[in-house]
């Protein structure tokens, strides 16, 4: 394709054969999906199990509450739980670096 706007010539690379249903020996392709799913008791049992949430790793960088040094943490959590941790860090929860933890 060259130019600012696509043309029909750019999109259609080859002509599809046209076929009259009365004279054509091959029927047109049926694109309808006839798939059916079986219902069973096993599927109902899966509904009782809790939904497994996606657990991801998060890198947290914050300052030590004692000396102000940068403290890096890597945690594994769900998105909802990491939001709770974020709120706790904004409120009263403080992280202490290893050097300050040894002193006290």
From Swiss-Prot:
A motif (Nuclear export signal) lies at residues 82-90. Transmembrane segments: none annotated. Keywords: Activator, DNA-binding, Early protein, G1/S host cell cycle checkpoint dysregulation by virus, Host cytoplasm, Host nucleus, Host-virus interaction, Inhibition of host innate immune response by virus, Inhibition of host interferon signaling pathway by virus, Interferon antiviral system evasion, Metal-binding, Modulation of host cell cycle by virus, Oncogene, Transcription, Transcription regulation, Viral immunoevasion, Zinc, Zinc-finger. One of its GO terms (molecular function) is DNA-binding transcription factor activity. Pfam families: E7. Its main location: host cell. Highly phosphorylated. It is found in: Host cytoplasm; Host nucleus. Homodimer. Homooligomer. Interacts with host RB1; this interaction induces dissociation of RB1-E2F1 complex thereby disrupting RB1 activity. Interacts with host EP300; this interaction represses EP300 transcriptional activity. Interacts with protein E2; this interaction inhibits E7 oncogenic activity. Interacts with host TMEM173/STING; this interaction impairs the ability of TMEM173/STING to sense cytosolic DNA and promote the production of type I interferon (IFN-alpha and IFN-beta). HAMAP family: PPV_E7 (MF_04004). Belongs to the papillomaviridae E7 protein family. This is Protein E7. The gene is E7.
């Amino acid at each position: 394709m060259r130019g600012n706007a696509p043309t029909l010539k750019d999109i259609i690379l080859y002509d599809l054969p046209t076929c009259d249903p009365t004279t054509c020996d091959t029927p047109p392709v049926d694109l309808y999906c006839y798939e059916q799913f079986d219902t069973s008791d096993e599927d109902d049992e899966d509904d009782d199990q809790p939904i497994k949430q996606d657990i991801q790793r998060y890198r947290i960088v914050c300052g030590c509450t004692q000396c102000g040094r940068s403290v890096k943490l890597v945690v594994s959590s769900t998105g909802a739980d990491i939001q709770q941790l974020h709120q706790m860090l904004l409120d009263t929860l403080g992280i202490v670096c290893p050097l300050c933890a040894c002193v006290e």
